[in-house]
Amino acid sequence: MTLRTRLAVGLLVLAVAPAASAQTADEVIEKSITALGGRAAHAKMKSRMTTGTIVVSTPAGDINGTIEVLNAAPNKARTLIKADLSALGAGALVVDQRFDGSSGYVLDSLQGDRDMPASQVDGLKNSSFPHPFLNYKDLGTSAKVTGKEKVGDRDAFVVLFDPTSGPEVRQFIDAETYLPIKMVMKVDVPQLGQEIEQTTEFLDFKDVDGIKIPFRLKASSSVQNLTITVSKVEHNVTVDESLFAKPK
């Protein structure tokens, strides 16, 4: 082998080495599942009740309220938010968002009751319980690592989830801890007649029954910022199926 050939081979090895060491989406996601507690621990979870407080920032000042989220396998969800808007001249606010696995409905004391928009329904169908990372392939969703970005001072893998229907989701997975620390997706806002991009940060992870749960979430968009602080998480609670359905 001539010196020129050896040099060319050496440069080729250097060129391909970074690509060979790059992690695939499957590897990153599986490490994230492990960091969150593992598949076996998640398999034990059939339902979850999360309670806490919510603060919504508005031009007129912060709105403080309570939030309850009930989840049940495989993808049922109910979110109940209550807040006092008397300081804004609007009285009590109650938003009861229900999804029974195939359709969704919102009971809203401020803006009126309504069916969920199709894009939101699709998003909830893709958000399987106890975690969407566990079976996204079974739902026909593809995933790929699109690079690395900073989330605050943390390096994070950016994994793009592309479902067969519904909005794409970008998950930012900490490159050291492998915990999912940020999510970006577009949400349909019928009141505005358009979609907006919403960023959600997952903070303050704590162990509950062998699973890592974020106890603080910060959501931001061009129209609204909110913070949810979790006070209690209960697994395998008794579920009233009627809470997921549209009231008759």
Regions found by a protein language model. Name each.
Residues N64-I67, A92-F99, R114-V121, I173, ...:
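Short amphipathic beta-strand/extended segments with alternating polar/hydrophobic composition
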Residues A22-Q23:
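Boundary of Sec targeting at the N-terminus
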Residues E27-G112, G140, K144-V145:
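N-terminal mature ectodomain segment of secretory-pathway/periplasmic proteins
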Residues D122-V158, P180-V184:
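Short, conserved active-site entrance elements at the starts or edges of catalytic domains
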Residues G152-P247:
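Gly/Pro-enriched, hydrophobic low-complexity segments
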Residues M1-G10:
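Bacterial N-terminal signal peptides that target proteins for export
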Residues Y105-H131:
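Acidic/charged, solvent-exposed loop-and-adjacent secondary-structure segments enriched in E/D, K/R, S/T
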Residues A17-A19:
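N-terminal signal peptide c-region/cleavage motif recognized by signal peptidases
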